[in-house]
């Protein structure tokens, strides 16, 4: 792992206040009351050190596989590769997890360490979460598979929040996210 790449510990939004307000308003479409309560709990529970019966969000790792080899990522280390399964989660297990949390957990993030969009049933997973009443379905991605047709499938499936990792601009991005090209992102 390369040790000279500085780690960005910030999270920045580059948008107008009006667009941010509209985004938040639309983000809760169809479950406004529940969403407001869910987001209030995100703030209040940690402050009061309250532990609810169920978590507010469950991360479901569809796979620890990734199609990149970013120099700062621990998933490229031999230790990680030797200790963590690099297979796709089976559909039956995914269904079982979602069935167990449906109606109890308001949000699911379909990623953890790997690139979730590589899973062959990725769009089906989003659909299943929404069908079971999960209010907010999100995922993290390196963006490598977000071609227009696939992106449309993801949106139509009901994904609520997509976080795309962009670590730098132009050459710096290409150095980190190789073999991706910044102009294509």
Feature locations, PLM:
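Conserved phosphate-donor/acceptor-positioning beta-strand/loop module used by diverse small-molecule
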Residues: 164-166
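Conserved Motif II region of HX4D acyltransferases
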Residues: 169
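Conserved alpha-helical substructure of the radical SAM core
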Residues: 2-161, 172-184
């Amino acid at each position: 792992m390369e040790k000279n790449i500085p780690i960005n510990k910030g999270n920045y939004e580059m948008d107008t206040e009006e667009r941010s307000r509209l985004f938040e308003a639309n983000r809760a479409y169809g479950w406004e009351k529940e969403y407001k309560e869910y987001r209030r709990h995100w703030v209040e529970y940690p402050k009061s050190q309250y532990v609810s019966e169920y978590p507010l969000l469950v991360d479901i790792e569809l796979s620890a596989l990734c199609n990149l080899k970013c120099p700062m990522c621990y998933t490229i280390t031999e230790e990680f590769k030797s200790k963590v399964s690099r297979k796709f989660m089976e559909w039956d297990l995914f269904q079982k997890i979602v069935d167990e949390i449906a109606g109890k957990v308001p949000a699911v993030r379909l990623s953890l360490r790997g690139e979730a969009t590589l899973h062959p049933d990725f769009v089906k997973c989003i659909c299943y979460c929404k069908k079971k009443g999960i209010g907010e379905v999100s995922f993290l991605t390196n963006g490598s598979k977000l071609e227009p047709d696939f992106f449309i499938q993801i949106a139509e499936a009901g994904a609520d929040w997509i976080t795309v990792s962009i670590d730098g601009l132009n050459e710096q991005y290409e150095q980190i996210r190789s073999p991706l090209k910044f102009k294509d992102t």
